Each structure stands twice: as C-alpha cells, then as structure tokens.
C-alpha cells in the first residue's frame, strides 16, 4: 500500500498557464479520460455558497468553454456533468460512463488510502483542494437504470458523500480555478493519479458487498368486507388455534 501511495505522488498533470486562465488542455483531458465528446457534455458555472447574489448561474455545452472561462474568472466555480445526455437534469441522462466518489470528511491521504484498500486503482483523480474526486471509467457506457443502484452501493461502501449518487451529478472541471465565497480564485483544480485504466462493470461490482435482501412484510389478517366471509380454510385455522387456549377456570381470576 505504501509503495502504491508513493507511486501516485508523482502521477499528475502539470499546468503551465498564466494565473486565472483556464487550462483548456487539462479540461479536454478530463473529457477524454471519461470517453466523452463535446456534443454530449455539459458545463455549469455556479457561485460559491454565501457569495455575491448578482452572480447568476450559467449552463452550456462543453464547446462554449471560452464562455465558461469568463464565468470562472468572475468568481463562479466550473463543473462538468459526468454522464452523457442532453442537459443537466436526471431525465436528460442517456448513458453513464463512470462511477465516482467524493469524501471531504477525511484528509486527502486518508481518502486515497481508504479507496485503495477497497476498490480498484482509479482511472484518474481530480483534486479540488481539500477533496479528491475519484473516478472509475467504464469500458462500455451503461444504462441509467443499471448505474443508479451500483453507484449507490459504491458510495455506501467507501463512505463517500451521498450527494454524489445522482445521475446528473456535476463535479469540478479539471483545469478550472477554485473560487471561495468571496469570489476570489484561490487554486487550480488539478488532475492526479492518471492511469487511464478502464473497467468492466462486473470487475467493479465484484469489489462491492452483496446487497442484503430486504425483510418481507408479514401480511396481516383483515376483517372481511361487510357481508363477506373468510375462506373456509382460514376459519378452520382460527378454530384450531382457539382450541389451544386453556379454558377459563371460575374463581381463579382468569
């Protein structure tokens, strides 16, 4: 484990851009590692919690990266919708290309060590500051109905943020700048641990605990509708059960 962690320390993507300029090459690599194209990829620019009220959210296709950069420079964070579709709502998602986790309850070293003890080596990681977004990219995209329960099981298993279970989840775009609540750009969102390895769905599922079956509710007997009767077998069972009750003995308080 220590050797693997040490190896990952040197695996990353360098940024050579000027301060506050979006690293377009890194943003495109984020897209390429997911196996996505610009036509099915959507971005969102959102202000940090507690920041300027006049900073309006923006959404658009990845092809409008220059517009997204301006929004970033104004103090909004930039996000990428990970799965493929026609927009940024769950109903818009048509194909799921990866599974992922985020965990900001632990240090970055603890996040990675915990992941590697449970799950395969990541395809890549996006480092946002205090948090790691860990990705497992699928060899073949899968349908949303198949993806949802597996993503939920993954998050539960690694104790990740339950908010990242949604189909249309957006995560920070690599190459963009992190904006604080004062709308100040403080650090570049970078990429690390880039292996490019992709996985069969079965390989990922094999790492997850089996789903425990839900207990089945015991049906309760209901009185028959007015004028109705119980089936004869049911009445016979009740009579047999009543015969097992000891008779009342007078004077014993029973």
Regions found by a protein language model. Name each.
Residues 123-130, 161-166:
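Short beta-strand
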Residues 1-97:
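DNA replication initiation on ssDNA origins
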Residues 2-6, 14, 50-52, 96-98, ...:
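Modules that initiate DNA replication and primer synthesis
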Residues 30-34, 65-73, 115-119, 151-161:
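Hydrophobic, Leu/Ile/Phe/Ala-enriched alpha-helical segments that form helix-helix packing faces
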Residues 163-215:
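Basic/polar, cationic surfaces and motifs that engage anionic cell-wall
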Residues 84-87, 117-121:
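Alpha-helical scaffolding within the catalytic cores
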């Amino acid at each position: 484990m220590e050797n693997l962690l040490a190896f990952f320390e040197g695996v990353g993507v360098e940024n050579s851009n000027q301060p506050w300029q979006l690293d377009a090459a890194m943003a495109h690599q984020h897209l390429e590692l997911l196996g996505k194209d610009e036509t099915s990829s959507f971005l969102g620019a959102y202000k940090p919690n507690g920041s300027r009220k006049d900073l309006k959210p923006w959404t658009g296709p990845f092809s409008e990266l220059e517009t997204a950069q301006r929004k970033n420079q104004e103090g909004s964070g930039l996000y990428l919708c990970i799965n493929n579709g026609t927009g940024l709502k769950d109903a818009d998602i048509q194909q799921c290309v990866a599974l992922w986790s985020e965990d900001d309850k632990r240090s970055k070293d603890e996040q990675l060590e915990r992941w590697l003890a449970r799950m395969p080596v990541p395809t890549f990681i996006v480092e946002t500051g205090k948090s790691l977004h860990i990705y497992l990219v699928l060899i073949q995209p899968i349908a949303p109905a198949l993806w949802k329960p597996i993503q939920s099981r993954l998050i539960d298993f690694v104790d990740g943020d339950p908010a990242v279970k949604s189909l249309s989840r957006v995560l920070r775009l690599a190459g963009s700048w992190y904006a604080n609540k004062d709308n100040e750009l403080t650090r570049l969102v970078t990429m690390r641990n880039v292996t490019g390895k992709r996985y069969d769905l079965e390989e990922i599922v094999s790492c997850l605990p089996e789903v425990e079956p839900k207990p089945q509710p015991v049906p309760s007997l209901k009185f028959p509708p007015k004028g109705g009767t119980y089936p004869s077998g049911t009445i016979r069972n009740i009579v047999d059960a009543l015969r097992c009750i000891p008779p009342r003995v007078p004077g014993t308080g029973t």
